[in-house]
Amino acid sequence: MARLFKVTACVPSQTRIRTQRELQNTYFTKLVPFENWFREQQRIMKMGGKIVKVELATGKQGTNTGLL
């Protein structure tokens, strides 16, 4: 069992709809290994996103986080 963080974040993604720009937020939840947490955090912040929730989780990467 690896030490993982269950991260829920919100990242703005820009989509073009008939010349006007609409801002659309994308929410996602993923398991991030303990060692890669800082890099993941930087990536989300750089994209202008917001980290909503962080929980400690145990398990394997690649499993559906909706089932945890």
UniProtKB/Swiss-Prot annotation:
Does the keyword section mention Membrane? yes
Q: Which GO terms describe its biological process?
A: photosynthesis
The UniProt keyword set, sorted, is:
Antenna complex, Membrane, Photosynthesis, Phycobilisome, Thylakoid
Q: Name one Pfam family in it.
A: CpcD
* Tree of life domain: Bacteria
Q: Which GO terms describe its cellular component?
A: phycobilisome; plasma membrane-derived thylakoid membrane
Boundaries of each CpcD-like domain copy?
Answer: 2-57
The membrane topology term of the UniProt record is: Peripheral membrane protein
Briefly state the protein's biological role.
Rod linker protein, associated with allophycocyanin. Linker polypeptides determine the state of aggregation and the location of the disk-shaped phycobiliprotein units within the phycobilisome and modulate their spectroscopic properties in order to mediate a directed and optimal energy transfer.
What's the main place this protein lives?
Answer: membrane
Compartments where found: Cellular thylakoid membrane
Q: What name does UniProt use for this protein?
A: Phycobilisome 7.8 kDa linker polypeptide, allophycocyanin-associated, core
The family annotation for this protein states:
Belongs to the phycobilisome linker protein family.
Which species is listed as the source? Answer: Microchaete diplosiphon
**InterPro entries membership:** Allophyco_linker, Allophyco_linker_chain, CpcD-like_dom
